[in-house]
Regions:
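N-terminal maturation segment of proteins
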Residues: 1-220
């Protein structure tokens, strides 16, 4: 059951799949909009129901495994129900950083690896647009992050969008690898899209999100 849950979660959250080392989803992002989070919520609810329907087990480790999985699922479901993904913005570990850091985790040894990288670069704008939709829904509900967090995130987005960013280094890595010229062109096109997507995110945070952000710093 746990393996099936991980497989289904990987399909819904390919970025998380890369972080977990689950192969087969490295060219995808998944849905980062409110609809995507609703799909994850349904998966969590469905898996929790399946655990409840299991017959009692007399084996210690099986009972413990069920309890651990149930606690994990319940915690994630509660987080979604509270709207946490709709205000998931901070300067250390939020989609703003994870979109970029995902490329660090992707293998770069083969043509297939670079095809996945090119695919993700070229579709990063869609993932970021979905993330903006979630943040906008959070604003509508009155769920926003602290102003200082937003300001730092704007700076981070501008760095990723600007000259000398990580994405330009990625272009150099592709040039040094044994990658066909046509694929290098796709990587460079994707880099342009990725940098532009981060600039759009910076503009959105500056012009739309920041005015509604919370003055008090989040603590605890």
């Amino acid at each position: 059951m746990a393996d099936h849950y991980v497989d289904q979660l990987a399909k819904l959250q390919p970025m998380l799949a890369t972080q977990m080392g689950v192969f087969g989803f490295d060219g995808q992002w998944g849905e980062h909009n409110p609809s995507g989070w609703q799909d994850i919520s349904m998966l969590l609810t469905r898996t929790l129901s399946q655990i409840q329907e299991l017959p009692p087990s007399g084996r210690h480790w099986e009972t413990l495994g069920r309890r651990v999985l149930k606690d994990h699922l319940s915690g994630r479901l509660e987080s979604i129900e509270l709207g946490d993904p709709l205000r998931d913005l901070n300067n250390i570990a939020s989609p703003i950083q994870l979109f970029r850091e995902t490329f660090d985790l992707m293998p770069k040894a083969s043509v297939d690896n670079w095809e996945a990288i090119a695919s993700r670069l070229g579709s990063l704008d869609g993932a970021i647009n979905g993330y903006i939709e979630s943040l906008s829904e959070g604003r509508r509900r009155g769920l926003t992050s602290a102003r200082r967090q937003v300001e730092v995130c704007i700076d981070q987005c501008c760095v990723n969008a600007g000259p000398g960013s990580y994405f330009e280094q990625l272009s150099g890595n592709a040039s040094n690898a044994e990658v066909p010229d046509t694929l290098r062109v796709e990587v460079d096109k994707g880099i342009t899209i990725a940098r532009s997507a981060y600039q759009c995110l910076a503009d959105h945070l500056q012009n739309e999100y920041l005015p509604d952000s919370v003055e008090a710093d989040g603590v605890g």
